[in-house]
């Protein structure tokens, strides 16, 4: 189904439609865990404490689920025995144990290897530092070893079952199996902490008039690419309801909030004047302020139509450690009053908040990007879905994903299941409705960068149905599949994913 923002056959309705409003809650009881106070910041602690906190929090839960699952196995005369420590497992005994997954990966960057290369270079008379290897999208290889560890030690996991299970370093699991050879545990089954409980929410009786939330990532304001600017202009006109007929405006009037999930601004580019004489050690590169200025202007314009939630991303001017802290309001001179009025909210990355009792967990994508390095497959959506049953959204932190060295909590543990789970800045649009064993329903959305695909997502807050909206231009028609090649004017395409959020042209304009 296509939604054209520029349709000459459709009379534009200049009568402004009243935008729906929603109840908003920043969920301090959940989101505050991601906030690092400047007064208590300390980087003196070791990262190992984070693993112990994670294991202490999830071990008992996983143990209870393992006992429930394996206490008695149909058709098995031998009753499995539970061991509380991995090094206590007896040989040739059907047993199960709970611990933290650790993947010993040959391709994983290692600072000790870097130091060894530098020492070797110095021994060979090389006086400069050896360059570090280039980062790769994958660090997985067939020679990797999978281990399970706890406070007692580590045991190697082997067998076809575990080899074909998608795991990453840092998750807590229970494994059923037999230690046939010393130090090697042949896995027969795996148990996870499971999807956490989910708060109930009321649903609207008329889903065609339910409020919607629009989600975008990778806007990269300040980019000088002409097609990016045109797509953003179309996006603004769509959200504000200034484009199209009554059906299009009816859709935009149901959007109660806009979520910007990271990479809001274009990365700065250094400019050095090559013509002026060089004074080594004193030359300074100059940077343009265009990205922050453009983002400021963008927020001022859109916040007059819809309330906005902002998360920093990996390429934004924010700290590199997770959780990234909110943008300072001082960055936005023109939009400052909008922050004070509450129409714009700056969040940590990741963050929690709710709209009309629908709870959203939003990340700018670093967590999925890092987990993706560990697995053989290419499904980023599968990793996002697995995060729910792992009850953890950043298991590879702090091993390969930089994070703050928390000493009293692991904020990335999921104590409850969100209704909408968003990961921004992914390679493509993907979505799935996950249903848990206790009636949980979570809409998982992986969203690509807007500058790459000109795509946003719209989610119905009542039904959790989701559709991508792709804005295309005649110069960038390759950005969206299924473009109307007979129409030379700019348009937008809505890809169907289960629910028609956009009515046909012969409808009355209500959705």
Where are these regions (language model features)?
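Extended recognition/assembly regions associated with phosphoester-bond processing machinery
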Residues: 1-511
